[in-house]
């Protein structure tokens, strides 16, 4: 009987202790995130990662935790870790476009163009007009040397955002890489009309003219 009482007391004590620990962690989660924001703002990405990971040790396995961790790891050039974190976020919320957009960043940073292309197409199946997915897909095609596809993708983006200079530059280079010099010259010329000191456009124009 005495042993039974002691066991009950022990169990109750353990439950209360765990509850207290969880409460303490729950209360500290906002502080952990806030500190990670502050370290990120200072450019201390490794420190921001270490701070944020304290939340995981406190039981935070949320979508937002993995999403933010993936972002910080990307900023800190920890691309493999970033891919893993973004994939975990995507698993937790399978239709999340933002997690997939995040995942594209470390894949592209590593030059994993085919993998990034696959993710871009997954996004476009959910949101066909996504500016980021379409513009990144155009850039991916360019880096895969699929210049005709890059041209088509840049034109698609420009049909909705005709004033986007960087998309115009991407299109001009895609044309030049296909040896469509007349079209490329016209495209570069249009850019330089409005942004005369654009470095990439000027470089492209020199190549068109064989300088």
Where are these regions (language model features)?
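Position-specific recognition of the canonical hydrophobic site in helix A of tetratricopeptide repeat
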Residues: 40, 67, 73-74, 108, ...
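N-terminal leader/linker segments that initiate helical-solenoid repeat arrays
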Residues: 2, 21-68
